[in-house]
């Protein structure tokens, strides 16, 4: 694995990203690879404050473009303050969600347009695209059922969207798999977690 590699994890709600991130952290530590692990939206104080606004269950009136722009603002601050410095120090960056979430959720599922959401993100990311994106694929029904059984996970505004929205999110990710086949790698997240991680490890070497 190259020094300063930027690796992101993507997937619908309940796909198991957080669990896999922890397993990647353990794997990197065992192999003496310097890394930071972070998430979007959030990862730093300013971005976490924006996250609270985005995911607040009371903000049901939020316009789709407002939502997209808030994600972009959070992303820029997170990149500038945490991700870019780590990459420049030669550390591997593991990020739970990044630009592809905006493209799938706001671009496709919200109907703004993948290219349109990409355009507003290009200003924010300033060329910092992931080197590798691991997409954990799961049927929305299964993912949402997992969330409902997980007492430790706080339910947010996006979790409360109708099933049709979550199906569109998955369709959006499939569009991105077609658009970026060299960067985005699809992993079957319906398997037991140890088998999911075996697939993940194959892309980390």
UniProtKB/Swiss-Prot annotation:
GO terms for biological process: dTDP biosynthetic process; dTTP biosynthetic process; dUDP biosynthetic process. Its EC number is 2.7.4.9. This is Thymidylate kinase. PROSITE patterns: THYMIDYLATE_KINASE. GO terms for molecular function: ATP binding; dTMP kinase activity. It holds the Pfam family Thymidylate_kin. Belongs to the thymidylate kinase family. Phosphorylation of dTMP to form dTDP in both de novo and salvage pathways of dTTP synthesis. NCBIfam families: DTMP_kinase (TIGR00041). The keyword ATP-binding applies. Transmembrane segments: none annotated.
